[in-house]
Structure formats: C-alpha cells, structure tokens
Amino acid sequence: MESKLAASLAEAGGERRGWWLYLLLCEGDRLYVGIARDPDARLAVHQSGRGAFYTRLNRPVRILAREWHPTQSAALKAEYALKQRKPEEKWSWTIERGPSLVADA
C-alpha cells in the first residue's frame, strides 16, 4: 500500500490525491466507517455535530485507522466491504493496517 501511495504522490507533484477509508472510535466504544479526501478535517466536522447522523448520536473520539485508495470508487468499495463486517472484524482490520496506516492517538 505504501508504494501505491508514494507513486500517486509522485504523479500528483507531491499533492495527496485520492481518498481515505477511515474508521472512527465513537463514544460507547462504537465504530463508524467513512471515506474522505482529508480524514482529519472530516473528523472535525463529525465532532462539531455537522457530520453524519450516526456521529451526531455517537460522538467520535478519534480516528483508529485509515487506508488510502487512489480513486473514490475504490474507496467506496472498500467502505462497503468494511461496513459489512462485524464489529470484532473491524477491530481486527484496524490492527491489520499496521503502524504506517494507523492514525496517531
């Protein structure tokens, strides 16, 4: 995954293009899956109460993990697949991403 990201950044002149699949930890140990070009900015929107309905009811605490995708279509497919998983499988997905793709606390 890192080489795909590096290649895309080089092609884009160093700009981060593409989409991020992200997993949020919300209050009550609930999980939320979404995609965004800038997951940190999207987290701020969710935390302000202007994001998805789910995150208005279950305020996000932090980003647990993120995974880069070159296109919105690829990110949407990955989002759908992750949303189909059980909560314990989503936690495993977070661990599988490894330190290079797991967001800082």
Please describe what each predicted stretch is.
Residues M1-P60, R66-W68, S73-K83, P87-E88, ...:
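GIY-YIG nuclease catalytic motif and its immediate N-terminal context
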